[in-house]
């Protein structure tokens, strides 16, 4: 059986990992063994944080809606309850956007919610 030399594939694999580690500090950017570990850990963080990003944005939207609704004399939970009862089908992302950039429209929605809760 012929001898297999792996220089071409090994070099390609090393180049690929070191390219991914570009911009890292210290030996993490130019020592293959350390760079490989750093790239693996970066991938784990990326995987985890893609899921956490969704939670963090939802929390941000809720905080913005809560702040805007409290200025108008309601709490977040009563506002969301009234929103469901009044049949307004806006999600938290759109509501938070309205609360920040279009206060007049958000105030109209809040008034609709208040009237639906009063009935």
Curated annotation (Swiss-Prot):
The keyword Ribonucleoprotein applies. The keyword Magnesium does not apply. SUPFAM superfamilies: Ribosomal protein L20. Transmembrane segments: none annotated. Gene3D superfamilies: 6.10.160.10, Ribosomal protein L20. One of its GO terms (molecular function) is rRNA binding. GO terms for biological process: ribosomal large subunit assembly; translation. Pfam families: Ribosomal_L20. Signal peptide: none annotated. PANTHER family: 39S RIBOSOMAL PROTEIN L20 (PTHR10986). Belongs to the bacterial ribosomal protein bL20 family. This is Large ribosomal subunit protein bL20. It comes from Nitrosomonas eutropha (strain DSM 101675 / C91 / Nm57).
């Amino acid at each position: 059986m012929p001898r297999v030399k792996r220089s071409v594939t090994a070099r390609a694999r090393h180049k690929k990992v070191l390219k991914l580690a570009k911009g890292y500090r210290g030996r993490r950017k130019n020592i293959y063994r350390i760079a490989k570990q750093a790239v693996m850990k970066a991938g784990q963080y990326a995987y985890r944080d893609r899921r956490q990003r969704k939670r963090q944005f939802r929390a941000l939207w809720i905080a913005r809606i809560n702040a805007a609704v409290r200025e108008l004399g309601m709490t977040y939970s009563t506002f969301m309850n009234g929103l469901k009862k009044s049949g307004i089908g806006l999600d938290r992302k759109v509501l938070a956007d309205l609360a920040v950039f279009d206060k007049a429209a958000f105030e109209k929605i809040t008034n609709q919610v208040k009237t639906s809760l009063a009935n």
